[in-house]
From Swiss-Prot:
Zn(2+) binds at residues 114, 118, 124. This is Endoribonuclease YbeY. GO terms for cellular component: cytoplasm. The gene is ybeY. InterPro entries: MetalPrtase_cat_dom_sf_prd, YbeY, YbeY_CS.
Amino acid sequence: MSVTLDLQIACADSTGLPSETQFQQWLDTAVLPFQQEAEVTIRLVDEAESNELNLTYRGKDKPTNVLSFPFECPPEVEDFPLLGDLIICRQVVEKEALEQQKTLESHWAHMVIHGSLHLLGYDHIEDEEAEEMEALEKEFMQTLGFPDPYKDDEI
C-alpha cells in the first residue's frame, strides 16, 4: 500500500519549497483512500512553463496553480499503477496564498490534494460534482491539520 512520488523541481529558485516528505504526505492523504498502489509525478514549475502547458492543453494564455494530467491506461493493460502527473506553478501558488490570506504550506497542500482528486477522476464543472470534490478536499485538509480551504469562498 503505497504511492510512489516522482518529484521534479523545474523552478529557477527552489528555496522555500515544501519538502519531498510533505509532498508525499499530502499525496498519500488524497490518493490512498481510493487506490492502494499508485505512481504520481509532481513537477514544480515557473510561470513560463505553466503558461505554455495551460495554453496548449486548456486554451488559456496564463499560468495556473495546478494542472492535472491523468494517465489513460490502454484497455488491455490491467492494474497499472501510474495515476498521472501534477504540474504546480510555484509563483501562482505563492500569489494565491498571499491574496487569500492562507499559509503557504496550507495552499501547497490544497493544490496537491485538489490535483490528486482530478487524477482520480473527480471534477468541479457541475455543481453536484464540485460539492463532492470540495467535501473531500475539506476532509483531507482537516485530516492534515489545515483549515477549510473554501471557508472564505462562501458569501
